[in-house]
């Protein structure tokens, strides 16, 4: 019984902690070719300044996840080399949110976009 109780704590604790943090993406559902995609991720239940990195990923239809990049709360950024020339990320600690801009979009950029911690 001790082992079962320990196992339940081990599994349940991370879910309890993670449930306190919520990320909510917002932005247009559709963007015209050659336009700029602008997305914002609002963070609740956690101070954006308390975590090192905040990121963006995407999943094209029928494909796997693709890393876009991530940003440090101070503003330092790291981008996927294949997207670097078109990506800009920013962070707004006063609003507890961070943003993604992807310029000159084409059909290749069709995907579900996610923010992540």
UniProtKB/Swiss-Prot annotation:
The segment annotated Framework-1 runs over 20-44
PANTHER family according to UniProt: IMMUNOGLOBULIN HEAVY CHAIN
Residue numbers spanned by region Framework-3: 78-115
Q: Name the segments for region: Complementarity-determining-3.
A: 116-117
The GO annotation for biological process reads: immunoglobulin mediated immune response
**Keywords associated with the record:** Adaptive immunity, Cell membrane, Disulfide bond, Immunity, Immunoglobulin, Immunoglobulin domain, Membrane, Secreted, Signal
Instruction: Tell me the ranges covered by the Ig-like domain, including all copies.
Output: 20-117
Kindly list the GO CC terms recorded for this protein: extracellular region; immunoglobulin complex; plasma membrane
Point out the signal peptide segment.
Answer: 1-19
- Disulfide linkages recorded for this protein, renumbered to the chain, are 41-115
Residue ranges of the region described as Framework-2: 54-70
Q: What is its main location?
A: secreted
What protein is this chain from?
Answer: Immunoglobulin heavy variable 4-28
The top of its lineage is: Eukaryota, Metazoa, Chordata, Craniata, Vertebrata
Q: Where is this region: Complementarity-determining-1?
A: 45-53
Q: Which organism is it from?
A: Homo sapiens (Human)
What does the subunit section of this Swiss-Prot or TrEMBL entry state?
Immunoglobulins are composed of two identical heavy chains and two identical light chains; disulfide-linked.
Segment Complementarity-determining-2: which positions?
71-77
Pfam families hit by this protein? V-set
InterPro entries of this UniProt entry? Ig-like_dom, Ig-like_dom_sf, Ig-like_fold, Ig_V-set, IgHV
* Protein role: V region of the variable domain of immunoglobulin heavy chains that participates in the antigen recognition. Immunoglobulins, also known as antibodies, are membrane-bound or secreted glycoproteins produced by B lymphocytes. In the recognition phase of humoral immunity, the membrane-bound immunoglobulins serve as receptors which, upon binding of a specific antigen, trigger the clonal expansion and differentiation of B lymphocytes into immunoglobulins-secreting plasma cells.
Q: Where in the cell is it found?
A: Secreted; Cell membrane
What is a single molecular function from GO for this protein? antigen binding
């Amino acid at each position: 019984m001790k082992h079962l109780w320990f196992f339940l704590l081990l599994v349940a604790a991370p879910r309890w902690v993670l449930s306190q943090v919520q990320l909510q993406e917002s932005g247009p559902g559709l963007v015209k070719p050659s336009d700029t995609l602008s997305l914002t991720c609002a963070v609740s239940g956690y101070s954006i300044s308390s975590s090192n990195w905040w990121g963006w990923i995407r999943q094209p239809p029928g494909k796997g996840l693709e890393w876009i990049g991530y940003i440090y709360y101070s503003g330092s950024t790291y981008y996927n080399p294949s997207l670097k020339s078109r990506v800009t990320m920013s962070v707004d600690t006063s609003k507890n949110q961070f943003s993604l801009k992807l310029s000159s979009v084409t059909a290749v950029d069709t995907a579900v976009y996610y923010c992540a911690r």
